[in-house]
Amino acid sequence: MQVTVLSGAGISAESGVPTFRDAETGLWAQVDPYEISSTDGWQRNPEKVWAWYLWRHYMMARVAPNEAHRTVAAWEDHLDVRVVTQNIDDLHERAGSTNVYHLHGSLFEFRCDACGSAFEGNLPEMPEPVETIDPPVCPCSGLIRPSVVWFGEPLPDAAWNRSVLAVSSADVVIVVGTSSIVYPAAGLPEAALAAGKPVIEVNPERTPLSDSATVSLRETASEALPTLLQRLPELLNRSA
């Protein structure tokens, strides 16, 4: 059986990864997300944007995968599992998942903004957050940026195509910790439902997907996932 997991910020929040909606450290609590997550913001103030993402890189590196990440990884022992994530952390990989597609890029990969070359150098140390820091410079003289998707940028083709295939070939799709409002990612469970596939939503809050999902559970990821596969036949029978 192939299980495709669509994961969002909620699964990593349980590990202590803050989202844009959380109160962050005092330095960044009032920052406009567009100011630090757009090409416009990068072009206006690359030093500020680089400082914010470098701090998040180190902050994410300090947190550990939680029970939900470990459960999804353990499913690979007896299932074909694909993980499509909107998260830019590496918690799925550190938990042991091997087929992970990052729709919004990764904060653990960096590239030149000018020539696109991958950055293999050392990152500057950052023991505490600062407002600005100079980005590294590529040999072509371009600035090094995080390999994440900013507002207005397209999703990476390879990750998107693999994600579409992962959903179209799945026997069941599990949507975990995502608000289901950010497109085109939010269209993936809709496509699965249109194809007649069971879609299980796991989210402590209702989302736009809740009414149409085959099963919608008001539970956190770490509460629901460890027993979800055992409960699956009963849940699907109840929804039929």
UniProtKB/Swiss-Prot annotation:
<feature type="binding site">
    <location>
        <position position="221"/>
    </location>
    <ligand>
        <name>NAD(+)</name>
    </ligand>
</feature>
<dbReference type="InterPro" id="IPR026591">
    <property type="entry name" value="Sirtuin_cat_small_dom_sf"/>
</dbReference>
<comment type="similarity">
    <text>Belongs to the sirtuin family. Class III subfamily.</text>
</comment>
<feature type="binding site">
    <location>
        <position position="53"/>
    </location>
    <ligand>
        <name>substrate</name>
    </ligand>
</feature>
<dbReference type="GO" id="GO:0070403">
    <property type="term" value="F:NAD+ binding"/>
</dbReference>
<keyword id="KW-0808">Transferase</keyword>
<comment type="function">
    <text>Involved in non-homologous end joining (NHEJ) repair of blunt, 5' overhang and 3' overhang DNA double strand breaks (DSB). Overexpression increases the efficiency of NHEJ of the above DSBs 2-fold with no effect on repair fidelity.</text>
</comment>
<dbReference type="InterPro" id="IPR026590">
    <property type="entry name" value="Ssirtuin_cat_dom"/>
</dbReference>
<feature type="binding site">
    <location>
        <begin position="177"/>
        <end position="179"/>
    </location>
    <ligand>
        <name>NAD(+)</name>
    </ligand>
</feature>
<dbReference type="GO" id="GO:0005737">
    <property type="term" value="C:cytoplasm"/>
</dbReference>
<dbReference type="InterPro" id="IPR027546">
    <property type="entry name" value="Sirtuin_class_III"/>
</dbReference>
<feature type="binding site">
    <location>
        <position position="115"/>
    </location>
    <ligand>
        <name>Zn(2+)</name>
    </ligand>
</feature>
<dbReference type="GO" id="GO:0017136">
    <property type="term" value="F:histone deacetylase activity, NAD-dependent"/>
</dbReference>
<keyword id="KW-0234">DNA repair</keyword>
<comment type="function">
    <text>NAD-dependent lysine deacetylase and desuccinylase that specifically removes acetyl and succinyl groups on target proteins. Modulates the activities of several proteins which are inactive in their acylated form.</text>
</comment>
<feature type="binding site">
    <location>
        <position position="138"/>
    </location>
    <ligand>
        <name>Zn(2+)</name>
    </ligand>
</feature>
<feature type="domain" description="Deacetylase sirtuin-type">
    <location>
        <begin position="1"/>
        <end position="235"/>
    </location>
</feature>
<feature type="binding site">
    <location>
        <begin position="86"/>
        <end position="89"/>
    </location>
    <ligand>
        <name>NAD(+)</name>
    </ligand>
</feature>
<dbReference type="GO" id="GO:0006303">
    <property type="term" value="P:double-strand break repair via nonhomologous end joining"/>
</dbReference>
<dbReference type="GO" id="GO:0036055">
    <property type="term" value="F:protein-succinyllysine desuccinylase activity"/>
</dbReference>
<dbReference type="InterPro" id="IPR003000">
    <property type="entry name" value="Sirtuin"/>
</dbReference>
<keyword id="KW-0227">DNA damage</keyword>
<keyword id="KW-0520">NAD</keyword>
<dbReference type="GO" id="GO:0071479">
    <property type="term" value="P:cellular response to ionizing radiation"/>
</dbReference>
<feature type="binding site">
    <location>
        <position position="56"/>
    </location>
    <ligand>
        <name>substrate</name>
    </ligand>
</feature>
<keyword id="KW-0862">Zinc</keyword>
<dbReference type="InterPro" id="IPR029035">
    <property type="entry name" value="DHS-like_NAD/FAD-binding_dom"/>
</dbReference>
<dbReference type="InterPro" id="IPR050134">
    <property type="entry name" value="NAD-dep_sirtuin_deacylases"/>
</dbReference>
<comment type="subunit">
    <text>Interacts with both Ku and LigD; may form a trimeric complex during NHEJ.</text>
</comment>
<feature type="binding site">
    <location>
        <begin position="8"/>
        <end position="28"/>
    </location>
    <ligand>
        <name>NAD(+)</name>
    </ligand>
</feature>
<dbReference type="Pfam" id="PF02146">
    <property type="entry name" value="SIR2"/>
</dbReference>
<dbReference type="GO" id="GO:0008270">
    <property type="term" value="F:zinc ion binding"/>
</dbReference>
<keyword id="KW-0479">Metal-binding</keyword>
<keyword id="KW-0963">Cytoplasm</keyword>
<protein>
    <recommendedName>
        <fullName>NAD-dependent protein deacylase Sir2</fullName>
        <ecNumber>2.3.1.286</ecNumber>
    </recommendedName>
</protein>
<dbReference type="GO" id="GO:0036054">
    <property type="term" value="F:protein-malonyllysine demalonylase activity"/>
</dbReference>
<feature type="binding site">
    <location>
        <position position="112"/>
    </location>
    <ligand>
        <name>Zn(2+)</name>
    </ligand>
</feature>
<feature type="binding site">
    <location>
        <position position="140"/>
    </location>
    <ligand>
        <name>Zn(2+)</name>
    </ligand>
</feature>
<feature type="binding site">
    <location>
        <begin position="203"/>
        <end position="205"/>
    </location>
    <ligand>
        <name>NAD(+)</name>
    </ligand>
</feature>
<feature type="active site" description="Proton acceptor">
    <location>
        <position position="104"/>
    </location>
</feature>
